UniProtKB/Swiss-Prot annotation:
CDD domains: DHDPR_N
Annotated EC: 1.17.1.8
GO molecular function: 4-hydroxy-tetrahydrodipicolinate reductase; NAD binding; NADP binding; oxidoreductase activity, acting on CH or CH2 groups, NAD or NADP as acceptor
Protein's recorded name: 4-hydroxy-tetrahydrodipicolinate reductase
Annotated TM spans: none
Length: 217
């Protein structure tokens, strides 16, 4: 697979570049704020950078007819409109979290919330101190899976890649459902699965849920 990385000098970009390359794929488009390395046309472009980069990323996808894997968080309605328009021309996989564990957890929560709908419920999420958006995109995904109004408590500490806990409680019991990312590599491995998933697709908008369904159902 010929691939491109937007934000290749960032922490996540470096991990993506490493994971894809070690799996035998060839980086031929590397984009960052101060440098662009353009060797050939990529089959898939991966962007885990910032919302501000999305318009440029979209233009490269259109230029090369490249499919897109996007894990950027804090997207607005404007950004989703860009992705919607792009998905009419190429295949797009968008998620706020590309770890397999979180996406399985989302499936579990959709079932659990129906059985625990009269229990109190709150979400806590902890990320590294340099993460700007609060709450995290993953916490929003968890809240959406619960399909109810819940408080989200956000902490920014040290270098934690991602720690999410959903708590259910009644007067005598507490259930904690927790996911902890030990390394950023888990997100890059998920992005690789997503890239392989859309490699030969012509167009359409997909989420990581579609990939989980194909893999496990």
């Amino acid at each position: 697979m010929r691939f491109g990385v937007v934000g290749f000098k960032g922490k996540m970009g470096k991990v993506i570049l490493d994971v894809f390359s070690n799996d035998g794929h060839t980086p031929i488009l590397l984009i960052d704020k101060d440098e662009i390395i353009e060797e050939d046309f990529p089959e898939v472009i991966v962007d885990f950078s910032t919302p501000d980069a999305l318009e440029k990323t979209s233009s490269y996808c259109e230029k090369y007819n490249s499919n897109l894997v996007i894990g950027t968080t804090a997207l607005t309605e404007k950004h989703f409109k860009i992705l919607e328009n792009l998905s009419k021309k190429v295949a797009v996989v968008q998620s706020y979290n590309f770890s397999i564990g979180i996406n399985i957890l989302l499936e579990l929560l959709e079932k659990a919330t129906k059985m625990l709908n009269d229990w109190d419920c709150e979400i806590t999420e902890i990320h590294h101190s340099k993460k700007k958006d609060k709450p995290s995109g993953t916490a929003i995904l968890l809240k959406n899976a619960l399909n109810r109004e819940v408080e989200i408590h956000s902490l920014r500490l040290g270098g934690i890649p991602g720690d999410h806990t959903v708590l259910f409680s009644n007067e005598g019991e507490l259930i904690e459902i927790k996911h902890r990312a030990i390394s950023r590599k888990v997100f890059a491995l998920g992005a690789l699965k997503a890239a392989k998933f859309i490699l030969n697709k012509k167009s359409g908008f997909y989420t990581f849920k579609d990939i989980i369904k194909e893999a496990f159902i």
